[in-house]
Amino acid sequence: RQAAIDREQNSRKPKPTVRKTIQEVYQEYCVNGRNDRAYTTKRKQDSLWKNHLCARFGERYIDEISAAEVVDYLTELYCSRGLSYRYVEGFLKMFYLLFGQAYSRNYLDVDSYNKLCVNKDTKIHMPKLKTDDELDIVAFSREELAILDDYFHGTNAETAYLLGRYCGLRINECYGLKWSNVDLKNGTILIDRQMQYQESRIKLVSLKTRNAKRTIQMCDKLKVYFQGLAERREQDQLHLADLREQNQRIIEDLDGSKISSTELVNCLPDGKIQTVNSMKYPTQEIKAKYGIMFKYHYLRHTYGTMMAELNTPQHLLCSQMGHGNIQVTQRYYIALSRAGIDILRENLNRL
């Protein structure tokens, strides 16, 4: 009965009266449909459009594009051009976006939209994953962590490293952390903004998603470290006041106000700001010295993997990591880490 009602309602929807090219649909979306989107989202969409989609599909009418044509194009990108699976997924999202915009503005009829985006047998989809492609979570082993702990100890990047190691922060969240969001008494850290470069300017902006805003619990080791860091900061404010004032950088905060770089947790004693680029040199040196492929985001993977191995309830880990979907968190529970394999073998030997 509900299906009949839905069909009746859809049949009353006005038929498309104006044909639009994909370029016209995208331009209309840019003007009217994405005012609430994040800066990085807009940049990524514009990059895919200008560098790939515009030349191939821009002049085509959106109502003449078939699902097979889209799937063939995605297959070409992934299999023939060798683009990564994750990158090609961005193209799939763009097509869903364009078809959705066209449907909502009556440039696509309901049957065409359902065929392209709803019906599981006909809708556009990613090509089959290659057998040699790895989408597994990359996490550091205990042995690698011991090397990294020793490498970062006492360096300018130690604070950022520990925030990734023991809190699982994203790199932009880490460098956007303000001292006012660190509660040493209760041992918590409030994550409510991130650092970004926008038009070559450093800004503190909104988080990646709504769920990314969260309060993180600090472990005892990190709490002790931050207590010492706060004490050293007080001493620096007294003894290096002139130098800090000279080297400070004024940046734009979340609310548009101007703040000093000295308000950030990742600020050098002399007042100089640290940014996401501060991890570039350690990344190169770790690879050269130890042969470890270090990416800051792998610390987040490691945090999630280790917390899952310790049987942390999924809803708690989801909250701590700021995931918008618990299915993302569940990946850490099914990933096979070295420690997980050891536990599995130990249990197998008990059979």
Question: What residue spans do the PLM features occupy?
Answer:
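N-terminal DNA-binding module of tyrosine recombinases/phage integrases
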Residues: 1-68, 232-261
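N-terminal core-binding DNA-recognition domain of tyrosine site-specific recombinases/integrases
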Residues: 18, 27-107, 272-278, 293-298
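Conserved hydrophobic/aromatic pocket- or pore-lining residues that grip, position, or stack substrates
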Residues: 53, 70, 95, 148, ...
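Basic, Lys/Arg- and aromatic-enriched nucleic-acid-binding interface segment
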Residues: 85, 89-93, 102-110, 114-177, ...
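Conserved tyrosine-mediated DNA breakage-rejoining catalytic core shared by Y-recombinases
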Residues: 118, 123, 177-254
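DNA/chromatin major-groove-contacting recognition/catalytic segments
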Residues: 146, 200-204, 331-351
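Short, basic (Lys/Arg/His-rich) helix/loop patches that form interaction surfaces
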Residues: 150, 154-155, 167, 216, ...
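Short functional hotspots where side chains directly engage DNA or cofactors
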Residues: 188-191, 295, 306, 315-336, ...
